[in-house]
Structures are given as C-alpha cells and as structure tokens.
Amino acid sequence: MKLCDFEVGLDKPFFLIAGTCVIESEQMAIDTAGTLKEITGALGIPFIYKSSFDKANRSSDASFRGLGMEEGLRILSEVRRQVGVPVLTDIHEIDEIKPVAEVVDVLQTPAFLCRQTDFIRACAQSGKPVNIKKGQFLAPHDMKNVIDKARHAARDAGLPEDNFMACERGASFGYNNLVSDMRSLAIMRETGAPVVFDATHSVQLPGGQGTSSGGQREFVPVLARAAIAVGVAGVFMETHPDPACAKSDGPNAVPLRRMKDLLSVLKELDALTKRSGFLENQFD
C-alpha cells in the first residue's frame, strides 16, 4: 500500500503514527511534530503526525474536548507546512469528512464507530487513506467485514480499494480494562489491509478514574515490542511533552523524551522479525 510518500506492508520497515492525543496549542503541536520528525528521520522510520481537534468520546462532559474543527485544522495545516510532515486526524461525523479531507493526508475512524456502515463508506469515499480502528467489542476476524465495506464503497466511487489500514487498540476485558491479544494482529492480516498496532490506547483503563480514563503507560513498551515481534505494518503511539499535564489521555501517553529510546528498540526488533519471516504462514 502506498501511504503518503512511502510504501507500507510486512515486507517494509514499520511506519509510525504519533503525536499528542488532542491538539492543545499550535506551539505544542509544531514543537512535538518537529521533535518526532527529528527522531524518526535519524532512525529512518516513516512518520505521520497525529492529533485530534475534538475528542467526542470523553468520559465526562466536563472534560476538555479540543479546540474545534476550524482551529484544529488550521493548526494541522501549519504543522504540515512548517514541519513538513504528513498529518492524520480522526473524524466523528459524516459532515466532518469533506473539510477534514481537504487538509489532512490520512483520516482515522474512532473504534466506537467501526460498525457504522454509512460512516465507514463515507470515509472510504473521501479519496484519502483511512486508518480504521477495530472496536474494543469486535473480534479480530470481524474486521474483514469492516474493511470490505470500505473497499466496496471505494469501488462504487471509482477509487482505489487498497487505501485502508486495520488498527488494533485492545479488547474490552471486564470493566474499565483492556487486553491485547497478539493473535489478533495475525488474524487481521486476513483482511488484506496493512495492520497497525495502537500501543497507547491498548494500555488505557477506560473510565478508570471516574470522570476520565486511566492508563498504564509503563506497559506501552511491553506491548509495542510484542506487536513488532508478531509483525505489523505500523505502530500508533500518542506522546506528550508532559503527560501528567496532558488535557486528554495523559496516563497512557509516552513521555516525548522517551520516544527515541523506544523507537530505537522497535526498529531493531522490526528488522529481525521481518528478516526472519513468518513461520505461521506455513502452519496449514
């Protein structure tokens, strides 16, 4: 699959989607994107900057949702222009798709909306690559139906059918908890779409702090290493200069100062995994 200006797949080095959970300010977005560009450039990791203009699924109505679509898109446009990196953001409503697609390089669908057929079809017909997150409630093999919906919609619109990624972000495991079943990464390959592992939302404790979600960021490196060992096309991670002060999802964000060390390890593991091949393909 061609994504932005690079090829992605199990025969290519992993790419990174990373940034702050929500856009907090223009300066933070530019600084964070710049730091990540420097790190990934030195390591040779293809990079897409990610941040949200609206967090529509916050636990509490009192929580910070974001700067809104107009201001958020302006800031993402500035990140793209000043830092020179492709940008990704998520959309929550069909009406948001057209204006957002005019600014960003990649769209992302929230996990909660993966079964909304009209929404998935509309995103697929935007002409942009789409990172489709698997719902916490969905079996990994059910993602084939979701990806097929997107492909059929693209075909109906005369657009490429290979513009979609399947993203794993953990599965509900009782109340206020998620678990990552690493088998799902191999199972989701059956969709034919590049598989992305969301290493930070996978350690989230949804609603675990009462009016906000908790998280266990110390397990991000653990799960990220495991996913790379299984074999994925890309890794998604949210990061923040000061997670304790983040306005959204701070408990599961990677401290920005730790990203270089983590990505260095993942790069080495990725090369080993893909050089060794995938023996599971011969276990039929």
Swiss-Prot record:
Subcellular location: Cytoplasm
GO CC annotation terms, alphabetical: cytoplasm
EC number(s) on file: 2.5.1.55
Catalytic reactions of this protein: D-arabinose 5-phosphate + phosphoenolpyruvate + H2O = 3-deoxy-alpha-D-manno-2-octulosonate-8-phosphate + phosphate
Pathway: Carbohydrate biosynthesis; 3-deoxy-D-manno-octulosonate biosynthesis; 3-deoxy-D-manno-octulosonate from D-ribulose 5-phosphate: step 2/3; Bacterial outer membrane biogenesis; lipopolysaccharide biosynthesis
Keyword hit for Transcription regulation: no
An annotated Gene Ontology molecular function: 3-deoxy-8-phosphooctulonate synthase activity
Top enzyme class: transferase
Keywords, in A-Z order: Cytoplasm, Lipopolysaccharide biosynthesis, Transferase
GO annotation (BP), single: keto-3-deoxy-D-manno-octulosonic acid biosynthetic process
Family indicated by similarity: Belongs to the KdsA family.
Protein name in UniProt: 2-dehydro-3-deoxyphosphooctonate aldolase
Organism (species): Ralstonia pickettii (strain 12J)
The gene coding this protein: kdsA
